[in-house]
């Protein structure tokens, strides 16, 4: 077995990023609390804080009296200093956002038909140019663009491997924006982006195993965070829940028959756009099976099908899922339906950009 070691510079960058992540999650916080909780020397904390301050990534927020009587300076993450263009395909929303998740500009983009990759890039570049002309950010603040797209995504190379919804295959997304939008190009599958939106708000980050299920007319899938990391799979095909097979001859856009998302779409259309008990049964079976396999601590259900549920249907779906989970009484399991997909995607785009700009693993 060969071992690789971090260079001094790589170790310094990782320490800096670890401290920045900690301040983002825990701030406002004192330097003393940082070195106590992170097991980093005082000298290292002082040096790293000075470095992050020089990059305008953290700022001081005032003083607070410590238990020993000394007044300490508190610091917090300065997400407003770094900005990103962002786009979510599901909502067709284009944003200018900062790394704190604040939306500085938003606009719904319309496409008369499914765009070709070049047409898609042209539309986003044009909107980015419009925002730039508005003077909403200083040139040095812009870090690039981050996209949430449906399909199989290689986030490391910023390429889309295959999307049945977009009818794209092997598209180099990074190349589409090269020299057209300053900074980096990040892309991730829609489910992972929404999941990060949930995970970085509220208390969900405390769960070591967390899943988000998209139940949408555009597709069905599951995304997971395990110990703080998005799961992608060996071939970037993690979470293709919509393509598990049922005993049905209904054709799917993937070219096969009987896929869960195709069957549910067919049932939905034949019911006149209503969520029927049969649809709820299929959704409950899929979610409970996934939970039985993965043993998550929290599951969130989102998407257009979930948005259409009445309160009674929502409660019934959750109960059906819980009723099919093995050894429920021995699990610390939380299941809930969320009705804010657009907001989750926007928050997730910002969170994802931060994680990619300042990686810790």
Mark where each language-model region is.
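Short glycine-rich anion-binding loops that position phosphate/pyrophosphate groups of nucleotides
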Residues: 150-152, 217-219, 305-306
């Amino acid at each position: 077995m060969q071992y690789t070691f971090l260079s001094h510079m790589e170790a310094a960058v990782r320490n800096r990023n670890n401290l920045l992540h900690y301040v983002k999650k825990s701030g406002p916080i004192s330097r003393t609390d940082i070195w106590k909780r992170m097991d980093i020397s005082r000298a290292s904390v002082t040096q790293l804080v000075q470095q992050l301050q020089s990059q305008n990534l953290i700022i001081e927020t005032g003083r607070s009296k410590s238990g020993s009587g000394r007044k300490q300076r508190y610091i917090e993450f300065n997400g407003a200093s770094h900005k990103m263009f962002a786009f979510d395909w599901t909502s067709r929303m284009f944003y200018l956002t900062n790394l704190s998740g604040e939306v500085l500009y938003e606009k719904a983009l319309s496409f008369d038909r499914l765009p070709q990759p070049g047409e898609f890039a042209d539309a986003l570049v044009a909107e980015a140019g419009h925002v730039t002309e508005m003077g909403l950010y200083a040139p040095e603040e812009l870090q690039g663009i981050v996209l949430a797209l449906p399909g199989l995504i290689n986030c490391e190379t910023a390429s889309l491997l295959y999307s049945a919804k977009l009818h794209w295959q092997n598209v180099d997304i990074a190349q589409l924006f090269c020299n057209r939008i300053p900074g980096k190009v990040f892309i991730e599958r829609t489910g992972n982006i929404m999941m990060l939106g949930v995970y970085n708000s509220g208390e969900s980050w405390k769960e070591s195993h967390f899943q988000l299920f998209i139940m949408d007319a555009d597709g069905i899938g599951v995304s997971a965070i395990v110990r703080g990391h998005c799961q992608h799979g060996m071939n970037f095909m993690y979470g293709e829940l919509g393509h598990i097979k049922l005993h049905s001859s209904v054709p799917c856009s993937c070219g096969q028959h009987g896929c869960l998302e195709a069957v549910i779409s067919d049932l939905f259309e034949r019911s006149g756009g209503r969520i029927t008990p049969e649809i709820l049964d299929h959704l409950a079976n899929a979610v409970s099976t996934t939970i039985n396999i993965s043993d998550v601590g929290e599951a969130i259900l989102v998407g257009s099908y979930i948005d259409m549920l009445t309160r009674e249907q929502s409660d019934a779906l959750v109960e059906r899922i819980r009723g099919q989970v093995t050894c429920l009484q021995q699990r610390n399991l939380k299941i809930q339906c969320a009705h804010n997909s657009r907001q989750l995607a926007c928050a997730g785009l910002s969170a994802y950009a931060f994680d990619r700009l300042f990686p810790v693993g």
